[in-house]
């Protein structure tokens, strides 16, 4: 029952008792809460509508309206209104979610003064295109604000975050992989994303900064941190000279230390530090579960009792206490008699101690002579252990793959094959069959150069989800293999097969594909390589998607559709009639210097991305509308 229907009933009874009785009736039927919700919602919509229609003072709006802001509501605002709303968010110190900030950023004017920039929420600036601030002074001011923002609003290794880091380094004048303390301060949270090559060449500056980073380091960063700390050529000195204060200063970097570094730290220092952090475990959080056992084992090591040192692996070891196994058993003896280790029914805890002894004996990885004899002991090694190995025998690989079958050891099996390929081995059909129960996502774990050893026939088995974690280089190589595998297939059947691999297709290949009426779905479109996609015109994308072109609207604020929109002229997008926004406004000229930023091993310069500039004097000559 709607409220207008209720009013005459209330009005027809002059008695307060009658009114109260009617309200009780409504309450018992559950109508009052609905009426309240409807009234509140209508009131909020009216307030927001009033603001959109001319209420200049956004700061007077209730905080709840900001927190519930949707992209649809933002899209109805003018650029000036969006700017006022964003400034009110900063003024009221409201924390919006990432998608809300992105929507607001897209509706802001293309030209912002320093004063306007200063008045915007810091986290919102993360979603602005750095190309909006050309010139040293403008970019320096922009990135001085970015350095104070919470960069973790953007996912690690996301395209937006990578672009911000590239442009920040370029603005700072950093070329190559050397950064100064001033550079790191200017980068702020973005410095946590600097690749391992920067860590290796700027360890004095970066190590203290990385120690305070919230997110986990990537593989290249961890490797570089370990190498520079192991060398002793840092402000912390060699691990053998470290103190409790040194370990405190390392903070989260303690979690990346390997066995060889931990063993070099004085035992009394480790014991004291363990007591120190046990009083306040929150300082290291979840990292404590990784660090504590590693340090405790080494700190509490005792001497072997007289007469207890074994000279062979036998059943007597079953009755040793764990600390006696730690103190008395020799790793080289275990390696020589691995067949006996597998035969005797040792407990899981005892086998873990044996593994620790082997790891200490071979800190750089097990020799192949031991790997060949591992047998069932292979179940106790980790993928990280295997990455250190050098395996050249295909028989060894096949034997260990049989051991791992049905043991939930996919990661170890993949690491083993990758290790074998890295040593120059070839992936034959027997190995592919042995890996048959493992999702083909393992292709992404192989190094790009090792993919050449993968038979083309495997491409017939690959599904879209198998390539989700592949790098761009992986996708490019797998795409070429897929083209070879499907060369005798044509028409729509070819498209159905090749679309899984289109993330590695070049812009030339995509242009050719657009001529065949494939009607690509939006899910496949989103997996296309950004560098290839942005090279396509509006007309080419329209041909590529066919009737699915309408789905662009739902993805316009997400990569890669957003990146493609940034490179198109707004007038061309308007012709689609989909209401797509974010294109290049009339009066702007796109200069693409086509110089790639290089965080790869082959390049040392950071090149500029595309830049939008306005040149009034050239407009008549260039006939820009």
Curated annotation (Swiss-Prot):
Lipid addition sites, GPI-anchor amidated serine: 600
Question: What do mutants without this gene show?
Answer: Mice have normal growth and reproductive function, and normal platelet counts.
Q: Which residues are glycosylated?
A: 93, 390, 488, 517
Ordered alphabetically, the record's keywords are:
Cell adhesion, Cell membrane, Cleavage on pair of basic residues, Disulfide bond, Glycoprotein, Golgi apparatus, GPI-anchor, Lipoprotein, Membrane, Phosphoprotein, Secreted, Signal
Could you describe the post-translational modifications of this protein? Proteolytically cleaved by a furin-like convertase to generate megakaryocyte-potentiating factor (MPF), and the cleaved form of mesothelin.
Expression (tissue specificity): Highly expressed in lung and heart. Expressed at low levels in spleen, liver, kidney and testis. Present in lung (at protein level).
Q: Which InterPro entries match?
A: Mesothelin (IPR010335), Stereocilin-rel (IPR026664)
UniProt xrefs under Gene3D superfamilies: 1.20.970.40
Q: Note the SS bond partners.
A: 304-328
Q: Which residues form the signal peptide?
A: 1-35
According to its record, what are the GO cellular component terms?
A: extracellular space; Golgi apparatus; plasma membrane; side of membrane
State if GTP-binding is listed as a keyword.
no
Q: What are the subcellular locations of this protein? A: Cell membrane; Golgi apparatus
Give induction info: By WNT1 but not by WNT5A in mammary epithelial cells.
Query: What is its biological role?
Result: Membrane-anchored forms may play a role in cellular adhesion.
Subunit comment for this entry? Interacts with MUC16.
**What is the similarity comment for this entry?**
Belongs to the mesothelin family.
- The name under which this protein is listed is Mesothelin
